[in-house]
Amino acid sequence: MTGIHPVDITSEVKTNFINYAMNVIVDRALPDVRDGLKPVQRRIMYAMLLEGLYSNQKHAKSASVVGEVMKKYHPHGDSSIYDAMVRLAQWWNMRYPMVHPQGNFGSIDGDPPAAMRYTEARMTKVAEELIADLEKETVDLKPNYDETTEEPSVLPAAVPNLLINGATGIAVGMATNIPPHNLTEICNGLLAMIDDPNLTLDGLMEHVTGPDFPTGGRITKTGIREAYATGHSGLKVRGKARIEEKNGRNQIIISEIPYQVNKTNLIQTISAMYKAGKIPDISALRDESDRKDPVRIVVELKRGAIPTLVLNQLYKYTQLQTTYTVINLSIVGGEPRVLPLLNTMQYFLDHRADVVTRRTRYDLRKAEERAHVLEGLLKALDHIDEVISLIRGSNTGAEARDALMVRFGLTEIQSQAILDMRLQRLVGLEREKLQAEFDELQKTIEYLRSILGDEKLLWREIKKEIRAIRDNYGDERRSTITELEEDIGKEDLIAVEDMVITMTKAGYLKRTKLDAYRAQGRGGRGSSGGKLREEDVNTRVFVGSTHDYLLFFTDQGRVFHEKIYDLPEAGRDAKGTHIRNLLPSLREDENIASVLSVGGFDEPGCFIFATRKGVVKKTLITEYGNITSAGLIAINLQPGDELIGVGIVNDIDHVVLATRNGKAMRFESDEVRATGRATQGVIGIRLREGEDDAVVSMALVPGGDEASELLAVSECGLGKRTPVGDYPAKGRGGMGVITLDVTEKTGKLVTLARVAGNEELMVLTEKGTVIRTRVEEVRVTGRNAQGVKVINIAERDSVISAFPIRREDEL
C-alpha cells in the first residue's frame, strides 16, 4: 500500500475553506460578546498580566510584550500583534484605551507608530478590570497553540468592553462594526436591566442614548433605535464646527471630526474640493492642531462668503459628515451572531453572573480551607504544652503528624500546619489574632454561601461591582446626539443671490447674476443683453432669487417648475438654453403662455388665470406644491380654449381683461372665488356672439391703484397710456368698456399691460421686425381714444406682440 489516498478535490476544497473561514471568524477577526476582545487582543492583555505591566508599574518595551505573545499564544507574525497593541493605545480609536503608551504610537493624521523596539507600554487602570479575578478560576483555560502552556478562553471582564470600546473586523464573508459607547450610560443601562428583567428597548434607551465616539462629533438620532433593535443600521455622524469672525472675515473652526476619519485626509479633501470649484469661498486652510487642541482645522472664508453655506458644502463634499454603518456582530457560544443591544448587554450580564459565581466558589473554598487550618491551630494553642511534648517525643516529622492526628482528632492538613507554625505564634497575642481571623472567616464563609444560595444576593453583588466601575471610570459624553437633520440638498449648497432671468421670443432661457447688469452703472450705453438672432428678442426679463421657483404655464393649461438655480447660468451676451431642452415634457403644439417666480408654495395669495374665451380662475398658491417633471394640470380648459395669462393676486388687487376688439373689463379679484387646481373657472368678460373676438391680455392692478396706467398697443402700431381710474370697476361677467377705438386705421388690440413708466416697450411685427422704445415716450390719452403712432409699420406688416420689460439700468 502506497499511503496515497485519492480524494475528490471539490469536497476537499470545500471542507478546507470552511475550516479556514471558521478559524478566521472565531479565532482572529471577531470579538467575543463577553469580554469584547479578539483573540490577539486577549492574548496581549494576558501577556501583560503575566509580565506584571500594571498601571502602577514601569513601562516595558513593546517588543517584549509582542515577543511573549507571539512565542506562547499567537504565532501569526509580530506586525499583526503590534498593530493590535498600538490600536489599544490610541485615544482616537479607543473610547477607553486599554494600553498606556510611551513613545510614538501614531497619530490621528494617520502617521505610523515607531518600531516596537523604540516604544514602551503598560496596562491602563481600566484594562486591569478586564483581567481582575483571573487567578480565581473564573474562566476556563485552554491549551495554547503548541500545548506548552495555557491561555484563557475569555477574560473575566468587569467592564462591558464590547460596548464601551466597540470593535471593527473583517472576516470571511462577514464583518463587524460595533460603535463605542459611554461607560456611564452602559453601566446605568445594565443596572436598569438587573432591576427590571422585562425592560424594553425604549426603557433601555432612556439610559443608553446612543454611541459615544472618542473623537466626539454629532450623531443624528435617526438610525440609533434601528441599530439597537436589529443590530444593523446606518448612523449619520458630523464633525463639530463653529463660525468665528476675525479681522472682518468669517472663519470656520473644526474642533471635532467623525470617528475613524483621518484628519490629514480630511484637510486634503477640503483642498481638493476648493480646487474643483465645489467649495469656492475658501481663502485659506490651516491645521492648528496641538497637544491642547488635538483637532483644530481653520477654514478662512473670502469676504462676503456665507459661512453656513460653506459649512453645508463641507458636510456634503468632505468627510466632515460620514455614515457609520453599525453591524453588531460578535462571537456567541462559538458562533458569529448579529445581536440587538438588549441581547448584547444580557450576554455580558450572564457572563458576569458566571464569573462572580465561580469567583465566589473559589473564595469560599479558600476561606473554608483557611478556616480549617485555623481551627487546628487554635486547638493546638489550647493544648500547647501537650502539643510541644508530643512533638519533642517524636522521632520524625511524619511520626509527629500522625501523633497529633490521633491525639487531637486533627486532619493531615491541620497537623502539618501545626508542625509548620513558627514559635513566635505561641505567644498569647498571636492566639487572639488567629481567633479574630477565624471569626471573620466564618462571617465570610456565611456570606459567600448566601450568595451561592440566593440569586438575588448574587445580582446585588454584580450591581455593586457595576456601580463601582461606573463611579471609578465613568465620564461625560463626547459625542452629541441631535434630532433629525435634513439631508444636505442642492439648495443648501447654493448661495442666495439675485438673478436676472431672460426668456426670448424664440424660447431661449438663461439666468445671469444681477451684479453683471449693475456693474456697468447708470448712464452707460447699455449692451445687447444676449447674442440673439436678428428676429429674436427678449420677451420676459425679471429678477428672482436663486432659491425661488420659476413656474412655466402653457397655453394648454399645464404648469412646470424649475428652481432658478437649475436654470443655465450664462453671461449677458450668451444665448441661453432652449425651453424645450429644459422642459422635455412640453408637447410639440404646446407653448409657454406665462412665466412667474415664487419663493415657495406656502406663500399667501392666489394664482389667477385668464383664457382666450374670457374665463378666469383663481386658485391658492399652496395647491401647486406637488408639481412633477411631467407637469401638472393648472386649469381645465374648455375645448378650443387656451390659457393666455397667469398672475399672482391678493383679495385687494384688481384684474383687467382686454379683448382683440378693444373691450376691457375691470373687476376686483375677490369677486372670483378660489377653487381647486383642476377646475375650469368662471366668466370674467363676456364676448359678443358672432364677433371674431378673444381675450388677448390680462393686467393686474395691485390694490386697485387708480393712479397707475394701462398701456394699449394695436396691430397698426398705435399706442397710448391711460390711467386705471378711467376704467370703471364693474362686476365680472360683463362685456366691458372701450379701451381702444378699434378701426381699420388702428387694427385689432394686441396688448393691454399695466406700466410704471420706466419700462421699455418691445414691439414685434409679423415680418420679424423688432422695435424698442421707452414707455414714457408713449402719450397719455383717454380710454376712448385711438392713441398715437408708437412705431412705423411697413406696408403689409402688422404688430403681433408688444410687451413692456424692465430696462437693464432699472434692474
From Swiss-Prot:
GO terms for cellular component: chromosome; cytoplasm; DNA topoisomerase type II (double strand cut, ATP-hydrolyzing) complex. The active site is at Y118 (o-(5'-phospho-dna)-tyrosine intermediate). Residues 30-493 form the Topo IIA-type catalytic domain. It is found in: Cytoplasm. It catalyses: ATP-dependent breakage, passage and rejoining of double-stranded DNA. Its EC number is 5.6.2.2. Pfam families: DNA_gyraseA_C (PF03989), DNA_topoisoIV (PF00521). InterPro entries: GyrA, GyrA/parC_rep, Gyrase/topoIV_suA_C, Topo_IIA-like_dom_sf, Topo_IIA_A/C_ab, Topo_IIA_A_a_sf, Topo_IIA_dom_A, Type_II_DNA_Topoisomerases. Few gyrases are as efficient as E.coli at forming negative supercoils. Not all organisms have 2 type II topoisomerases; in organisms with a single type II topoisomerase this enzyme also has to decatenate newly replicated chromosomes. Heterotetramer, composed of two GyrA and two GyrB chains. In the heterotetramer, GyrA contains the active site tyrosine that forms a transient covalent intermediate with DNA, while GyrB binds cofactors and catalyzes ATP hydrolysis. Belongs to the type II topoisomerase GyrA/ParC subunit family. A type II topoisomerase that negatively supercoils closed circular double-stranded (ds) DNA in an ATP-dependent manner to modulate DNA topology and maintain chromosomes in an underwound state. Negative supercoiling favors strand separation, and DNA replication, transcription, recombination and repair, all of which involve strand separation. Also able to catalyze the interconversion of other topological isomers of dsDNA rings, including catenanes and knotted rings. Type II topoisomerases break and join 2 DNA strands simultaneously in an ATP-dependent manner. NCBIfam families: gyrA, PRK05560.1, PRK05561.1. This is DNA gyrase subunit A. It comes from Deinococcus deserti (strain DSM 17065 / CIP 109153 / LMG 22923 / VCD115).
